[in-house]
């Protein structure tokens, strides 16, 4: 732990208490990702919303143009011919009532759960298990669908679901330290555009409050979100 602490302090010393230009910020986070594994790069967006009100909640998906840099395990709850379709599309776990029972019993070795509409009455009883983990299928995020092949392909290619937590903060993983700075910036722009495009109808006053990015083991870096928005608007 001592070496990690020293490394973190050294990395933290390179970060100034200011909002960095977007490309400068991702480059600095990359430079400070010095762990012996490929660190995940995350964005933390503080928004001016209060999610306890339904018209100030944010839950949506973002398609990262440069991918996520990681493989995800997808489970699909369906029946009939859709079982073979889901397996052919690459889902790791596929089943009907038996899979529902397995999940209820604690089988959670998947990162994303997709369900066909006809199975949602069965899936509904898993709310207590899936809800706290953010895994409950939802039509708004494309995880309740009859087109399981397309859904699986999209999520495998880099589509991510995210939501604002109780404090109004959005946490999104948008790449790996091994990505180029330009690719990380492209993904970060997609996150920003998605957050703006899905602004809750009840949001009042200043929507964006702050944006920080960080790597798994590195210090956080503040990003000038206005400059990020300007980059997107210029395209």
From Swiss-Prot:
Keywords: Repressor, Ribonucleoprotein, Ribosomal protein, RNA-binding, rRNA-binding, Translation regulation, tRNA-binding
Highest taxon of the lineage: Bacteria
Family stated for the protein in its record: Belongs to the universal ribosomal protein uL1 family.
InterPro entries per the UniProt record, alphabetical: Ribosom_uL1_bac-type, Ribosomal_uL1, Ribosomal_uL1-like, Ribosomal_uL1/biogenesis, Ribosomal_uL1_3-a/b-sand, Ribosomal_uL1_CS
NCBIfam families: rplA_bact (TIGR01169)
Gene Ontology molecular function terms on file: rRNA binding; structural constituent of ribosome; tRNA binding
PANTHER family for this protein: 54S RIBOSOMAL PROTEIN L1, MITOCHONDRIAL, LARGE RIBOSOMAL SUBUNIT PROTEIN UL1M
Subunit organization: Part of the 50S ribosomal subunit.
Transmembrane annotation, as ranges: none
Organism: Synechococcus sp. (strain RCC307)
Family matches, as HAMAP family: Ribosomal_uL1_B
Protein name from the UniProt record: Large ribosomal subunit protein uL1
Purpose of the protein: Binds directly to 23S rRNA. The L1 stalk is quite mobile in the ribosome, and is involved in E site tRNA release.
């Amino acid at each position: 732990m001592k070496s990690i602490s020293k490394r973190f302090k050294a990395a933290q010393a390179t970060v100034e208490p200011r909002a960095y230009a977007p490309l400068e910020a991702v480059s600095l986070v990359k430079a400070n990702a010095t762990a012996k594994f490929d660190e995940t790069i995350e964005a933390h967006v503080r928004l001016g919303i209060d999610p306890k009100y339904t018209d100030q909640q944010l839950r949506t998906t973002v398609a990262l143009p440069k991918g996520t840099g990681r493989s995800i395990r997808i489970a699909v709850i369906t029946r009939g011919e859709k079982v073979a379709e889901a397996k052919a599309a690459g889902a790791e776990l596929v089943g009907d009532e038996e899979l529902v029972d397995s999940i209820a019993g604690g089988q959670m070795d998947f990162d994303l759960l997709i369900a066909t509409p006809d199975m949602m009455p069965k899936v509904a009883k898993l709310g207590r298990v899936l809800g706290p983990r953010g895994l409950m299928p939802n039509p708004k995020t494309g995880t309740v669908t009859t087109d399981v092949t397309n859904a699986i392909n999209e999520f495998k290619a880099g589509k991510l679901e995210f939501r604002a937590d109780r404090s109004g903060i959005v946490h999104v993983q948008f790449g790996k330290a091994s990505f180029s700075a330009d690719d990380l910036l492209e993904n970060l722009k997609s996150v920003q555009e998605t957050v703006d495009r899905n602004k809750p109808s009840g949001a009042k006053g200043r929507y964006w409050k702050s944006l920080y990015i960080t790597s798994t083991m590195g210090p956080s870096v503040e990003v000038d979100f206005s400059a990020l928005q300007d980059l997107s608007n210029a395209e």
